[in-house]
């Protein structure tokens, strides 16, 4: 049958260092390649298509034999792709010892009925691994620092800055909440925010959360820099087992910026308005600003969440009314003087 009369074949296409895929259809390898290059804004000369699974190059002879909805990798001149299982082998070679048994098990997974799901889970891991994972300075891993200002000399230093920037943005939102209270209460509101800012400054804006060199309990990652998604606000864990190591390579560093430090009890909808209401309704009571501080800036109310697990729906959670104000100190009992006999 003439290719012109055939129904276009559909594929899922992505570039070499991207997890994002999109659908493309065509009646020839050349048509699919042309559409893919246009979508990804890549040059057509020197580019080619390979099957994600095993690296087989998609040519005119093989085009109609490829399964529908096959996943393709678009390679430009000089790029190579040996397939998913070969990538596992490359990953394991970092440890400089043979893992033939694991490679064989990985091959079996490809034939398993759940292979697409397992491939994705393994790809999340493999895509973040680099043999420079232990490198820390700009001199040790120059590609990691591409696009960053020269003042960043270490990976940990940049990740601390990244975390601090997020926390500072939260503080700015809290400060802007002063508009929610009347003029008579605004001074008190800003005084409480000032206390929070002083505590944040003393804690370096909790920037240690992203620092793999920080002490356990002060960081969200392993000593090697691996972060795990903590799941949506309404569950205890991530069922997809999302993980990433932004210390491994530039692509993972950029991708990590899309992960969210999500407030379980929502910052803008709940916590900031509750703080404003507490100041307005204080009537002589002392607002427990440290309670609000923990909700706004600490892991008591923050979860690290992959973008796919970040639910933008209303959380329908509220602050604890019993913790909004400081508990009045109990009056000290007077001690009666002893009379000497």
Swiss-Prot record:
SUPFAM superfamilies: CAD & PB1 domains, His-Me finger endonucleases
Family annotation (SMART domains): CAD
Stored PANTHER family: CASPASE-ACTIVATED DNASE
Transmembrane domains' residue ranges: none
Enzyme class: hydrolase
Matching PROSITE patterns: CIDE_N
Alphabetical GO biological process terms: apoptotic DNA fragmentation
Free-text activity regulation comment from the record: Inhibited by DFFA (DFF45). Interacts with HIST1H1A.
One Pfam family from the record: DFF40
Purpose: Nuclease that induces DNA fragmentation and chromatin condensation during apoptosis. Degrades naked DNA and induces apoptotic morphology.
Subunit structure as annotated in this protein's UniProt entry: Heterodimer of DFFA and DFFB. Interacts with H1-1.
EC number assigned by the record: 3.-.-.-
GO molecular function: DNA endonuclease activity; DNA nuclease activity
Keywords from the named record: Apoptosis, Cytoplasm, Hydrolase, Nuclease, Nucleus
Cell location: Cytoplasm; Nucleus
Gene Ontology CC annotation, any one: nucleus
Name this polypeptide is given: DNA fragmentation factor subunit beta
InterPro entries, alphabetized: CIDE-N_dom, DFF40, DFF40_C, His-Me_finger_sf
Positions of the CIDE-N domain: 7-83
